[in-house]
């Protein structure tokens, strides 16, 4: 048999369409309702871990200044009315309070991990304070 030269042919785009199953056809023929896209959601815990990393890197104060100032003034009212505070004094109080809370939460987290949990509970805070000698 003699060899013949083959000429290039235009392709028609792959495989021939197959018949769809009844369930697929029913799904495709159903009307699309508005095309509203669901908002993206991260897996549980992903955002929490991202926030932990972000706050551990940062050095700024985490409690808002004005609400903290109102709280300090409200507590000070119980001891003496008409007390005045320098802004630097309230700033120093806020630094001390935040440092205390961060270290308390670190100890609380260790107590929860010791109990084979990842969620901190009230009893973890109580145990951490008791071990520190703050509360009997």
From Swiss-Prot:
Its main location: nucleus. It comes from the Eukaryota. Gene3D superfamilies: Histone, subunit A. The modification N6,N6-dimethyllysine is found at residues 5, 15, 28, 37, 80. InterPro entries: Histone-fold, Histone_H2A/H2B/H3, Histone_H3/CENP-A. The nucleosome is a histone octamer containing two molecules each of H2A, H2B, H3 and H4 assembled in one H3-H4 heterotetramer and two H2A-H2B heterodimers. The octamer wraps approximately 147 bp of DNA. Belongs to the histone H3 family. This is Histone H3.3. The lineage of its organism: Eukaryota, Fungi, Dikarya, Ascomycota, Saccharomycotina. The gene is HHT3.
